[in-house]
Swiss-Prot record:
The organism's place on the tree of life at top rank: Bacteria
Site (described: Transition state stabilizer): D71
Subcellular location: Cytoplasm
Keywords, alphabetical: Cytoplasm, Decarboxylase, Lyase, Porphyrin biosynthesis
This protein's name: Uroporphyrinogen decarboxylase
Enzymatic reactions: uroporphyrinogen III + 4 H(+) = coproporphyrinogen III + 4 CO2
Entry's Gene Ontology cellular component terms: cytosol
Function: Catalyzes the decarboxylation of four acetate groups of uroporphyrinogen-III to yield coproporphyrinogen-III.
Amino acid sequence: MHDRFLRACRREPTDVTPVWFMRQAGRYMAEYRELRKKYTLLEICKTPELALEVTLQPLRLGMDAAILFADILLPLEPMGAPFEFAKGEGPVIHEPVRDRAGIERLRVFEPEEGLGYVLDAVRLIRKELDGKTPLIGFAGAPFTMASYLVEGGKSSDYRLTKQLMWSDPEAWSALMGKISEVVRRLLRAQVAAGAQAVQLFDSWVGSLSIDDYREHVQPHVRYILRDLEATGVPVIHFGTNTGALLEAQRDAGGTVIGVDWRTPLDKAWQRVGYDRAVQGNLDPLLLCAPRAVAERRARAVLEEAGGRAGHIFNLGHGIIPETPVDTVKAVIDLVHSIPRASLQGEPDR
């Protein structure tokens, strides 16, 4: 197997820095846009053969890992909170959950029953990859999932989410407990189906203060991540705008800590500790900059990592649809062209 990515997750030396990108399969690729002319996003997610096709599409660019094509909100439907993707609006939850009665109605389900198509896709992709490229599974983290449920979709300030968290901590804990159990089971099931690493996406957790994170979120994330340790697969713990939360994220768990572009990678690694691998952290919009600028800034990220074992090159969030494929390929090629040993920095430890 081409295991550069998995070796880096375990902080083992690699020849060059491994690279993959969040949303590496998606609308920036012409072949994906062609597929979307025939199928909706949910149709692709719910059809294992289509999820396989989309998962494999970007690998021609040279990524060191494949990531399952799915959506973090898929568990909401079997939990009893159906949603749709409204054009121009993003996800819309038809019946937001904002009180104890709504929380009580949410179901904790078995993944093979509620999300069997996701696990079928994992099995299909793993078989097709045939050991050539490792497969990453994923799920949304409890706070991000809860914010969608409470807000009814995207939010600019998470006002309703925070109001519930502060006004009724017991109800909030019950909501987070149900989501955490669903996420734990789903990630466990993905590993059993063949995922060789998993990522927990906490896209909106950066809206919280460190105190609120530690009190209202960290225990639930820790529950998931500590359980996953028993599987033996690497777990990537990722959030955006989490510069104030890095130490708390580390304490919650994860083999690898994902870092966004707002915090310099060298400073972030010092804070989480060199006993963890780190992932990141190019600003995704730099892939829309002139190629020379993108390459220069990518090299700067590598230099901040200092050649230390345990760095996985990625973006600070997902690739945006307007990104030129040629620039994505150029950055991947650049990362792979620089021997890790040639980068100045601390020795492996």
